[in-house]
C-alpha cells in the first residue's frame, strides 16, 4: 500500500515539475507543446472539471447567460443600445422605401428599351444593320475572310428556308434555359410559344409597396385571356414584435388570376379513371375523377393564406418557392431576358460556382499534400489558444 502511495506521490511531483517548466520563459514550438500539455493536465484534474461543470450548469438553456449575469446598471445601458438598434431598423426601412421609389422612377427610363425589345421579338420592328452590329469578345474574334465566308453561307441557308418572323419562341427558350425549366412541363410548351412579353409594374407613389408581373399572350387555342397577372404584396418596415429580424423588404403575399381555359384545354387538370369494387356484391364500377396536374400555369393559382395566417408545411413551402420565383422574374429574367435566351447569363452563374469549386479543390489538394508528407505532424497545427473571429 505504501508503494502505491509513493508511486502516486511520485507522479504528482512529476506533474508539478512539468507545470513549473511551462511557467519558464520559453519561445517557439516548445512553448506551444508545453502549453498543450498543461491544458491536458488541467482537464484531467477532477477539481477543475467539477468547477467548470458547475459554471456550465449555471448557463444551461441560457444562451445569454453572460448578459443575465451583468449588473443591473449595465443591463440598462444594453437596453439603450437595443432602442438605438430599433431606430436604425426604422431608418433602414425608409432607405428601402426610397430605393423602391427609385426603381419606379427608372422603370420609366427602361420601358422604351423593353418596348423595342418587344417589337423586335414579335416582328413589329426590324432592326437596322447598325443596331444588329455586335462586337464579339476578343477570344471569339475571327479573321475578316472567315467572317465573310460565314456570312455568305448564312445567307444561302436563309434563302433555302422560309424567313422566320421576329425571334420565334423567345420566352419559351428563356424559361427552358434557366432554373425555371423545372416549372415548365412538356404540355406547357405549346402554350408558352404564344407568350409575347413579360412586364413588371410597380405600385404608384404613396400606395403600399407591391409589384405586378404581367404575362402577355397572343390569341391561342388554350385560353381567352390576353394577359395573365401575378401580384406580390411587399412590406418594408420592422415587425413590432421582432424588430431585429428586419433585413429589407419582404414579400408578404401574392395573388394570381383566373385563367379562362377553353373547353378541354386546361393543362393544370387531368382526368383519371378508377375501378371500385363493391365489398358486398363484388361488382366493379369505373369512377372518373379530376385531379390537379403539374404545370407552369399553377403559378397563377398560389395557395390562399387563411385569415389567421396559419398554413400547413406544404403550402408554406410552395409559397416560399413562389416568392423566390417572383423575385427572380422581376430582378433577373425581365431585365436580362436576352442573356437567358442565349444562355450567357447561365454561363456567368456557372462561372461563379466554378470559381468557388476551384478554390475548394485547391484547399483540398493542399490538405492532401500535408497528410501525405511523412514529416507532417497534425498536432503542430493545433493551437487551443486561438479561435476564429467572425
From Swiss-Prot:
Residues with PTM 5-glutamyl polyglycine: 358-359
Residue positions where N6-acetyllysine is found in the record: 116
Keyword field contains Phosphoprotein: yes
Residues bearing PTM Phosphothreonine: 62, 64
Molecular function terms from GO: chromatin binding; histone binding; histone chaperone activity; kinase binding
Compartment(s) where it occurs, according to its Swiss-Prot or TrEMBL record: Nucleus; Melanosome; Cytoplasm
Modification sites for N-acetylalanine: 2
Residues covered by region (Disordered): 1-32, 131-163, 345-390
GO CC annotations, alphabetized: chromatin; cytoplasm; melanosome; nucleus
Biased composition (Acidic residues): 11-28, 131-143, 345-375
SUPFAM superfamilies: NAP-like (SSF143113)
Keyword Magnesium: no
Propeptide stretches in the record: 388-390
Pfam families named among the record's database cross-references: NAP (PF00956)
Notes on the domains: The NAP1L motif is required for the histone chaperone activity. The acidic domains are probably involved in the interaction with histones.
Binding partners and assembly: Homodimer. The dimer binds strongly and sequentially to single and double H2A-H2B heterodimers. Interacts with ERCC6; this interaction increases ERCC6 processivity. Interacts with RAD54. Interacts with SETD1A.
Family to which this protein belongs: Belongs to the nucleosome assembly protein (NAP) family.
Name of the protein this chain belongs to: Nucleosome assembly protein 1-like 1
The species this protein was found in: Rattus norvegicus (Rat)
Gene responsible for this protein: Nap1l1
